[in-house]
Regions:
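Catalytic-core helical/loop segments in enzymes performing group transfer/polymerization on anionic/lipid-linked
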Residues: 1-414
Length: 414
């Protein structure tokens, strides 16, 4: 408090506390839904985002055989530990008490088997992204691995292959027997060659395949999509820091201001969904720009008919927009969002054509430039050539009418 200017007065406000818990299913309908969910997760290939139940059953059938290749899983202790990396970390054992105190009740309540019987003929099963959220499901997968089974993890959205560092995914998903990507084939580990390389399998994902070239303009609206703004960093990755997210939010203001009143009148803003401990989003934007309307309801159908899409971050929506052929402009501060070398090269090509900008104001200037006919600019030969390169690297689409054959062939070979 002593560092404040003399004219300032500091007042300590009331403590703000949010508690988010996963309620136990109550009632017959909820219990039935929970049971069906557990049965779905028990499939060799559970239903994943963007995939149908029919595909999950077909892909599960393709994984019924014993594994046909040597196990390519990487040991965390053997590849990522301080000993494996040649580091000396003298952390006192007393520090473990801190970790124990923060251990979630969902994990603390688990009971682990003392012994696991090995599989006679190890098989591969695909892991749902729920392995990050469901402690019991995660334990089930750990038992599978403990018995010698192999895991296939599957990319479920953006950032994979694009962020320079994505430590949780690197250690949890990339270390498994195989990882199905949306097109990319390599990742430069933060720990270098000593940590090894993942078994990356580029496959056309159904979530993107269904949207292939599906954009048809039906409105005069530009949709401006934002992302989560956490005030506490909850994993080590190449996202902005909490302080940088404050500037990220300020950039939204400069972007909307630079659009001018005519474009703002046609602008819809799409905030990220509510997450505990994040900055105010729409509550901060809309009062500053009353002309801007809130984009509500399912996002997919709206962007498939919009006049122009603008993104202030890279993520799943960018990949879907490229697959669907939506006229899209992007901006973000590259020092806030460090990217992989492959994505960085592609951003250079996108910047040369005005598809991506390093500042909010320059992006707004491009919006005004193409506003009369965004589709004419988007469908120009140079822009479409870069779009095709983007799709080949980060949003792979099937060669034929269906993506199923590529998946079935791959799964049968594992």
């Amino acid at each position: 408090m002593n560092d404040l200017p003399q004219a300032w007065t500091a007042v300590e406000g009331a403590r703000v506390e949010e508690r988010w818990q996963s309620p136990k299913p109550a009632g017959l309908k909820a219990r039935l839904k929970d049971f069906l969910r557990s049965r779905m997760l028990a499939l060799p290939f559970p239903v994943m985002k963007g995939m149908t139940a029919r595909q999950a059953l077909a892909f599960s059938s393709a994984l019924r055989h014993p594994s046909r290749t040597p196990d390519q899983s990487r040991s965390l202790a053997g590849r990522f530990s301080s000993q494996a990396q040649g580091l000396v970390l003298d952390i006192p054992k007393e520090a473990l008490a801190v970790f124990d105190a923060f251990l979630p009740a969902s994990i603390r309540g688990l009971r682990h088997p003392r012994k696991l019987s090995p599989m006679a003929r190890p098989r591969v099963r695909a892991a749902s992204i729920l392995l990050y959220e469901d402690a019991r499901y995660r334990q089930e997968l750990a038992r599978w691995r403990g018995r010698g089974g192999r895991l296939l993890c599957v990319q479920h959205g953006g950032n994979y292959g694009q962020m320079r560092r994505i430590c949780a995914m690197e250690m949890v998903e990339y270390t498994q027997h195989a990882f199905a990507t949306w097109g990319w084939t390599a990742y430069d580990s933060a720990l270098g060659a000593a940590s090894g390389q993942g078994n990356f399998l580029p496959l056309p994902h159904p979530q993107l395949a269904r949207q292939r070239d599906s954009w048809r303009r039906t409105s005069d609206d530009m949709i401006f999509v934002g992302t989560e703004m956490p005030t506490v960093a909850y994993q080590l990755d190449s996202h902005p820091t909490p302080a940088q997210f404050i500037q990220y939010r300020e950039d939204k203001q400069w972007f909307l201001e630079a659009l001018g009143p005519e474009v703002r009148r046609h602008t819809l803003y799409r905030p990220y969904f509510k997450v505990p401990g994040t900055l105010e989003d729409a509550e901060w934007i809309i009062p500053r720009f009353p002309q801007v309307r809130l984009c509500q309801g399912p996002l997919g159908p709206q962007i498939l008919g919009c006049r122009l899409l603008c993104l202030d971050h890279h993520g799943t929506t960018l990949l879907e927009a490229m697959a669907a052929g939506i006229p899209t402009l992007c901006y973000w501060n590259p020092s806030f969002w460090p990217v992989s070398s492959g994505f960085g090269d592609l951003l250079g090509d996108m910047a040369a054509l005005g598809m991506w900008h390093a500042s909010a104001e320059f992006c707004a200037e491009k919006v005004r430039e193409v506003w009369d006919d965004p589709a004419a600019w988007w469908n120009s030969a140079p822009v479409q050539a870069v779009r095709r390169r983007f799709l080949a690297h980060f949003a792979l689409l099937p060669d034929g009418p269906s993506e199923d054959k590529a998946w079935l062939d791959c799964l049968r070979s594992l």
